Amino acid sequence: MAALDGLPPLRDVIQRHGLDAKKALGQNFLLDLNLTQKIARTAGPLEGVTVIEVGPGPGGLTRAILALGAKKVVAIERDSRCLPALAEIGAHYPERLDVVEGDALKVDFEALADGPVRIIANLPYNVGTQLLVNWLLPGRWPPFWQSMTLMFQREVGLRIVASPDDDHYGRLGVLCGWRTKASLAFDVPPQAFTPPPKVTSTVVHLEPIEVPIPCSPAVLEKVTQAAFGQRRKMLRQSLKPLGGEALLAKAGIDPKRRAETLSVEEFCRLANCL
């Protein structure tokens, strides 16, 4: 990558700007520039596309996205220490990098959209799941994004793509399965990062289902939270606060079943009966 874009190696950038990763911000910087290119390529063709990136840090993934031809990258970065390093990338790619300093959980992402949008990010571990849920549950659908290519801890990635009767199946699997086609792209070993996390990471690619099963996002979330909050109990017990056996009878679902056995369609049916 250094030869490809003419910018210095990431280790040099991190050392020059004193960018030790902060655990409190969920930071793990990805140093392998071959891997950052692989992540960017997983998102598909980037020419003419605006890419939203969360937590760019020193900019390894940002560089890959720009080198592969994205029209623009809008990078959300909370850590002000990273801004000078990102400014150097912006100078190398004039008018193609906008950096927004702030908390990604408080950003209006739809307002940042400029034409076709893909979200590509090595998400901070401490906010990654909440950001994904926020992107999945807007009232308007199809969403503002064409696809999401995101890195998570492998455990979270398995939950995203899980299906019924899978040990990893839960609220996240239902929400992702309802509105997206999600797939695991590839794993990333701990030694690719600084500092190395204790777990393997994985890249997940999600594309929106244009017309998902009609259902209220808020009600579906309420049903899945109740059902998986006591996942080992029968549904008649775990869904008691929402109507229990009466709700299940209305939806035509056996009250002796457990949450992990229900399909996305059955969860939507329950939500629509509330």
UniProtKB/Swiss-Prot annotation:
Enzyme superclass (EC): transferase
UniProt-annotated binding residues for S-adenosyl-L-methionine: N28, L30, G55, E77, D103, N122
A cellular component term, taken from the record's GO annotations: cytosol
Catalytic reactions on record: adenosine(1518)/adenosine(1519) in 16S rRNA + 4 S-adenosyl-L-methionine = N(6)-dimethyladenosine(1518)/N(6)-dimethyladenosine(1519) in 16S rRNA + 4 S-adenosyl-L-homocysteine + 4 H(+)
Enzyme Commission number: 2.1.1.182
GO MF, any single term: RNA binding
Record HAMAP family: 16SrRNA_methyltr_A
Gene3D superfamilies given in the database record: Ribosomal RNA adenine dimethylase-like, domain 2, Vaccinia Virus protein VP39
Main localization of the protein described in the UniProt heading: cytoplasm
UniProt function note: Specifically dimethylates two adjacent adenosines (A1518 and A1519) in the loop of a conserved hairpin near the 3'-end of 16S rRNA in the 30S particle. May play a critical role in biogenesis of 30S subunits.
NCBIfam families the UniProt entry points to: ksgA
Name recorded for this polypeptide: Ribosomal RNA small subunit methyltransferase A
SUPFAM superfamilies per the UniProt record, alphabetical: S-adenosyl-L-methionine-dependent methyltransferases
Domain of life of the native organism: Bacteria
Subcellular location: Cytoplasm
Gene name as annotated: rsmA
